[in-house]
Amino acid sequence: MAYTTAQLVTAYTNANLGKAPDAATTLTLDAYATQTQTGGLSDAAALTNTLKLVNSTTAVAIQTYQFFTGVAPSAAGLDFLVDSTTNTNDLNDAYYSKFAQENRFINFSINLATGAGAGATAFAAAYTGVSYAQTVATAYDKIIGNAVATAAGVDVAAAVAFLSRQANIDYLTAFVRANTPFTAAADIDLAVKAALIGTILNAATVSGIGGYATATAAMINDLSDGALSTDNAAGVNLFTAYPSSGVSGSTLSLTTGTDTLTGTANNDTFVAGEVAGAATLTVGDTLSGGAGTDVLNWVQAAAVTALPTGVTISGIETMNVTSGAAITLNTSSGVTGLTALNTNTSGAAQTVTAGAGQNLTATTAAQAANNVAVDGGANVTVASTGVTSGTTTVGANSAASGTVSVSVANSSTTTTGAIAVTGGTAVTVAQTAGNAVNTTLTQADVTVTGNSSTTAVTVTQTAAATAGATVAGRVNGAVTITDSAAASATTAGKIATVTLGSFGAATIDSSALTTVNLSGTGTSLGIGRGALTATPTANTLTLNVNGLTTTGAITDSEAAADDGFTTINIAGSTASSTIASLVAADATTLNISGDARVTITSHTAAALTGITVTNSVGATLGAELATGLVFTGGAGADSILLGATTKAIVMGAGDDTVTVSSATLGAGGSVNGGDGTDVLVANVNGSSFSADPAFGGFETLRVAGAAAQGSHNANGFTALQLGATAGATTFTNVAVNVGLTVLAAPTGTTTVTLANATGTSDVFNLTLSSSAALAAGTVALAGVETVNIAATDTNTTAHVDTLTLQATSAKSIVVTGNAGLNLTNTGNTAVTSFDASAVTGTGSAVTFVSANTTVGEVVTIRGGAGADSLTGSATANDTIIGGAGADTLVYTGGTDTFTGGTGADIFDINAIGTSTAFVTITDAAVGDKLDLVGISTNGAIADGAFGAAVTLGAAATLAQYLDAAAAGDGSGTSVAKWFQFGGDTYVVVDSSAGATFVSGADAVIKLTGLVTLTTSAFATEVLTLA
């Protein structure tokens, strides 16, 4: 008939319990209506699509209430939950607008299953003591149905394993802790299980697969006409009201006697529990499930040792076995129609064999030293927690016909027991280490042996780490992966893809291998290609790396010619990776691609003829390339080492770095930096690259390396850098505005000679850049009047660099940056301005001693934010300004003016001065110190309070005050006195015998302003102002 937009709006509004669609949803409904009118969409499809739009509201209420209370809400209940005038937090109100659909299912599930929730009591009774994996497995089968999902193309075992993986449990546990009031472990456990069920309900709703989704869709369709035909004030049983081909059937409980039980045509549940401690699944029992999708729950405290003699089970699709002790079970005979076997125990061993076509999930909590061994089955999942030395073995006697998934968690410091898997189409082994900080756990060695069906293997572990006060130590276990045909000379292998996430010493042996995915921490990896005598048809290996760091080599262990990989493709993604060594004897081509940096610290590949990099971030090759190898760079920042290459090397568009060990290249050789700001690193004794046409396209010249020293012509370069060197280094012909950056501690003096230093205002910029304290050595600059020094800390840990500067023409030194600087100012007698006021960071102390020798010269010295040490000249008149830190300002003579700045400063008086040439302190304040050790020439000034000031009449002169303060005999023990005169305060140290102030023997320090020193006290000749 074709729908109108108004009709679909009405249907939506009814299904949404009266809440009309918003503008965007209305546009969607208009599109559906138009499609029915043009023939692009059937009426049924348009209505179905319309009603799916209330999955995040109405469907949430229907499904969660059905699962946790046994009935869906009545019409009135749905009105209250979905769109109510009295419920201010219904599903269409602002409160839930921030919730995605899945989180709405989780929220409703937790609220119903815990605390005072309507289903809390029943949920606790059913799920307390049940593992997370078992919760997921049974809920998945109940909500979606294993058979239904399998028919729809879903890998049920993989889905269950994914939902019950430890990372998801950890996430949901953290979510529950953060978003609920629960603190007790039991409450949190139940809330996490409810959240898992909410996740499955959402998955069913999104996919539309399973009984819950089908019945819910039918109920919403019923609502869409404005009335609920099945309404019941007590709630609507979803499956009774909207029956499908498979609905909940009967619950049949076994007795301690011999039982013969037959299910209905619906989905029945058989319960084999205990009666007065006695098992109810006993000798001779016969269980027939009938036509539905049926479940047998076998629960007993005692060990399960086998199916009791004579027991016959048929037509039951799922068997859940829970024991308080060990489980030994074989369902490969005596059981027909079984598609899922789920076993669960705690603190005990499991030995389980599943029959053909049976998906097996074996869950063990607190496994400890107990062993788990499973055989047979289709898709097999083994999930163990609390493992110590217990081993895990899969397929030793009979391999799974489908996938194999093993997860093992160990929180102790006992080495995890070995894990061994044989067979399976795709094998996944995941280890999780949860030991405490400052302890070390060695993870399990993993052995995977393929069979003729095994094509892919994944092994992951928690990344290795060294134990410390805040770090848990982890050691990765060895990994051995062997194809079933590895030993065959005639049969080709099957394992084509291997994924390793953190690994110890690892080996892979398969002639079919084409792809290896690596991440995390790794020790070493050896890749073999089996014993196949024929040359492998695929000689290309793809290594996908993501955040990988290895301590050893990745080795193609096939040494025979033409037997190893000839092309290796390395792709970096997400996070940068470092491979300590790449060994590939047969490789002729290496391609490096991706969007995360790849570093290969060293490589051994004698046959290699070409390396091509297309990685957008760049690649670093730490070993020198063979002289006959062609390298082609990409758009990223690539870094390589060259000798006397005979090839034309083009670096590409990035900011590249090329290190050369020869100042001249081989015949026909050349290297071009390409676009970008490129660095040419001279690891040679002297160079003149600008004169050699073989070198081009480089903007920065860096001298660094074990052979780096000598004279280097800087002509043509716009920047200079210096690293660790073998000896003294000279940069010549340095152009104007070309600076030098020191990156590492050099050996010997570094001399910079300008191309033209005849001017009187030459400026040179010197940068010290490092993450830790840098000993920059001696830098000599000739003919430079201004030296700008930037001390740059490249991380957040404060440090102080050291530098000796020889710049005898310099008049001004300016220091900036976020690192401190201890500057040795050698021979720079012309400097009249030292300015470190732009240095930031309280840990960035600056040390400077003026070397100015001109009598009466005015010299200005400024400190920065750190605790600086600034020393004036003995001959010049210095103005020293400390800045923000707790500085030390040192007086060595002359008429000086000191300003400490903020912070508790130390004014170190190391020269006596005269009655007219002395130091003035402009901002002496409480907490500051006057260090007078250097001027008390006749014995220590006595400790204790300073006491009262010397006072004279109003007409007294400064000279009279000085005489009065020095009237005592200081020839035996120096005596300190103080007085105030002319609005300022003076401290006198009397070290002479006379009764007057003796200039040159006695000392005076002026404090600007009236500073009361009565309670200030001496300790070891240091006066602390109070």
Swiss-Prot record:
InterPro entries: Hemolysn_Ca-bd, Serralysin-like_metalloprot_C
Highest taxon in the source lineage: Bacteria
Keyword list, A-Z: Calcium, Cell wall, S-layer, Secreted
Subcellular localization: Secreted, Cell wall, S-layer
One GO location term (cellular component): S-layer
Keyword flag Calcium: yes
Main location (coarse class): secreted
GO molecular function, a single term: calcium ion binding
One Pfam assignment: RsaA_NTD
Functional description taken from the UniProt entry: The S-layer is a paracrystalline mono-layered assembly of proteins which coats the surface of bacteria. Probably acts as a physical barrier to parasites and lytic enzymes.
Other remarks on this protein: The calcium binding of this protein may mediate surface attachment by ionic bridging between the S-layer and a specific membrane-associated oligosaccharide.
Name of this protein: S-layer protein
Organism: Caulobacter vibrioides (strain ATCC 19089 / CIP 103742 / CB 15) (Caulobacter crescentus)
